[in-house]
């Protein structure tokens, strides 16, 4: 008798909903609505989405206007890097200041967190808006000081513009 009372709670409406595959019909209706909407797919090589001025891409080392390297070999970026991707060696100049002799970034280790850029007291290391680069071998993504300076020299106007646009938020 108790079994009959328990099955009585299952109504005829519920039976038709389950028998007629109501959930399947609702799912197909939802799929149909999205089928005829405007597509949001970006055809990447031809179309590009706008980048934020804070986008963190390929690293670069900057120079002062007189051509001197900005890096003072304080090694803060090396110390703060959570991935241990930065290696710095330095020498003392005749005037007592330090300058880097070796500044390497292993991009296979780098997580592009931006801590190196934030910790730099002279804005020497920056992350550029460049995200289209690749390496065919593991060593291709190991950037030396000369390579980083070349990137900085080539993209200095863009880097300076991004820094200026972001200055009021820092």
UniProtKB/Swiss-Prot annotation:
Cofactor: record remark = Binds 2 [4Fe-4S] clusters per subunit.
Which keywords does the record carry?
Answer: 4Fe-4S, Cell inner membrane, Cell membrane, Iron, Iron-sulfur, Membrane, Metal-binding, NAD, Quinone, Repeat, Translocase, Ubiquinone
Q: Which top class of enzyme applies to this chain?
A: translocase
> Which prosthetic group or cofactor does it need?
[4Fe-4S] cluster
Q: Where is the 4Fe-4S ferredoxin-type domain?
A: 62-91, 101-130
Instruction: Give the way it sits in the membrane.
Output: Peripheral membrane protein
Q: What is this protein called?
A: NADH-quinone oxidoreductase subunit I
Q: Which organism is it from?
A: Acidovorax sp. (strain JS42)
Query: What gene does the UniProt entry assign to this protein?
Result: nuoI
């Amino acid at each position: 008798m108790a079994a009959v009372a328990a099955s009585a709670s299952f109504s005829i409406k519920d039976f038709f909903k389950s028998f007629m595959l109501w959930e399947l019909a609702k799912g197909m209706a939802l799929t149909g609505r999205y089928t005829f909407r405007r597509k949001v797919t970006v055809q990447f090589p031809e179309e590009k989405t706008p980048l934020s001025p804070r986008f963190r891409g390929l690293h670069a080392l900057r120079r002062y206007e007189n051509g001197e390297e900005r890096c003072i070999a304080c090694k803060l970026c090396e110390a703060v890097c959570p991935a241990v991707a930065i290696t710095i060696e330095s020498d003392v100049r005749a005037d007592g200041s330090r300058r880097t002799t070796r500044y390497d970034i292993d991009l296979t280790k780098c997580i592009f967190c931006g801590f190196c850029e934030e910790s730099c007291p002279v804005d020497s290391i920056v992350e550029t808006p460049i995200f289209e680069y690749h390496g065919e071998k593991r060593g291709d993504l190991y950037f030396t000081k000369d390579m980083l300076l070349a990137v900085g020299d080539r993209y200095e106007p863009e880097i300076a513009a991004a820094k200026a646009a972001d200055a009021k938020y820092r």
